[in-house]
Amino acid sequence: MKVLYLGCFCEPTISTFIKECTKGVITVSATTFQKALLAGCNECGIRPDYIVNVPDIGSFPFRCNNLFFSKSKFEYASIKGVNASFFNVTYLKKCSIYHTIMREAKLWLNKNREEKVTILVYSLIYPYLKAAIDLKKMYPNVQICCIVLDLPEYFGDSTSLLYRFLGNLETKRIYSLVPSVDSFVLLTKYMREKLNVGLRPSLLLEGIYNPVCIVPQKKRKKTILDFYRFDLTD
């Protein structure tokens, strides 16, 4: 069996460029998790065979100066991959991401038609999950496993009425896709019920620990304030 990883992280070859063109704070949680996940897979010798990646960045013009991101090849944790090209325009971005994922994934899947393939999708982000499911319909040798760290109704934090309206519509579209997912990696057991996992295979993931990142510290003497030593009546 082969594994195609469908991700959305800022891998090292593009991280500097993304920092330069991003307005405001860069969200790093998705990138941190995925880099740790892929590095861990490499250490365990069970790494994916290929990565199709569309980095998680803000949209033009409000959160990013860049209108278009070009295609580029990279290698991370001994895994070869491609940063797919896409238009980074607000509201058009998701459609562009869907089509570019389809294009890049088909190039790889066409070379692996004789193999069983699992598409490992990071998160329930609509264009990524929609692309994976449509690829499954096109290739009978494909199954889908989705990593779920958050539920779609909690995506984003905008108070805009339009944003919330569109977000609610997209949440419903995402949940309509979930029955087509074959297996799950879940952050909590409560997600099983919410996603109606049923008898489908699922794995609970409590977190990722990297001992290399832990810096040893010297033990220090602790000073404990003892309130009973004070006369509070003065």
Regions found by a protein language model. Name each.
Residues 1-69, 114-115, 183:
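N-terminal subdomain of nucleotide-sugar transferases
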Residues 4-6, 218-234:
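Conserved donor-binding/catalytic core segment of Leloir-type glycosyltransferases
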Residues 29, 143, 153-176, 211:
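Nucleotide-sugar donor phosphate/pyrophosphate-binding loop at the beta->alpha transition
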Residues 35-39, 134-138, 152, 164-184:
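Membrane-proximal helix-turn-helix segments that form the acceptor-binding/catalytic region
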Residues 50-116:
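A conserved catalytic-core segment of Leloir-type glycosyltransferases
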Residues 171-217, 227:
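Donor nucleotide-sugar binding/catalytic pocket of nucleotide-sugar-dependent glycosyltransferases
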